[in-house]
Amino acid sequence: MEEPQRARSHTVTTTASSFAENFSTSSSSFAYDREFLRTLPGFLIVAEIVLGLLVWTLIAGTEYFRVPAFGWVMFVAVFYWVLTVFFLIIYITMTYTRIPQVPWTTVGLCFNGSAFVLYLSAAVVDASSVSPERDSHNFNSWAASSFFAFLVTICYAGNTYFSFIAWRSRTIQ
């Protein structure tokens, strides 16, 4: 007794998508926001980049490895300098409008808040490590880097405030 063979009929539907399709927009050209640099947050980001560059180059040009505390200052200064340049590029090219999946106001608040706290600690460490008795040859560079570290800290505090205002206005809506 053989069972009759039934015709197998299965419908299979497949779709193909790519990760890049989720981030595509209608235009392929980059936008450029000229007005961003004229805003106070834009000005503060440029100031953070310039002053942060001064902080780590003034230390890097010395024999900072003799004072272990300057390792922390160098880490914070270089790390946040690179990330701030990255964020400036994102803001100027308006890349944040092309990636709406990222909560940019929250990212900005977390970035600026952490930069403020860590730069404040680095500035205090920098200032407390400067001593003319320790190394008179590097004293001026280290003292100047300490001064600029506090200025960068003030800039990050300002951007933290503006990021908080933007974040709060997004969460209230």
Curated annotation (Swiss-Prot):
InterPro entries reported for this sequence: MAL, Marvel, MARVEL-CKLF_proteins
Pfam families attached to this UniProt entry: MARVEL
PROSITE patterns, per database record: MARVEL
GO biological process, alphabetically ordered: chemotaxis; myelination
Domain MARVEL: 36-168
A GO CC term attached to the entry: extracellular space
Keyword tags: Chemotaxis, Cytokine, Cytoplasm, Membrane, Nucleus, Transmembrane, Transmembrane helix
Tissue: Highly expressed in liver and pancreas.
Any coiled-coil regions, as ranges: none
Superkingdom, natural source: Eukaryota
Listed GO MF terms: cytokine activity; structural constituent of myelin sheath
Transmembrane regions listed in the UniProt entry: 40-60, 70-90, 105-125, 147-167
Database matches in PANTHER family: CKLF-LIKE MARVEL TRANSMEMBRANE DOMAIN-CONTAINING PROTEIN 8 (PTHR22776:SF10), MARVEL-CONTAINING POTENTIAL LIPID RAFT-ASSOCIATED PROTEIN (PTHR22776)
Family: Belongs to the chemokine-like factor family.
Protein name: CKLF-like MARVEL transmembrane domain-containing protein 8
Name of the coding gene: CMTM8
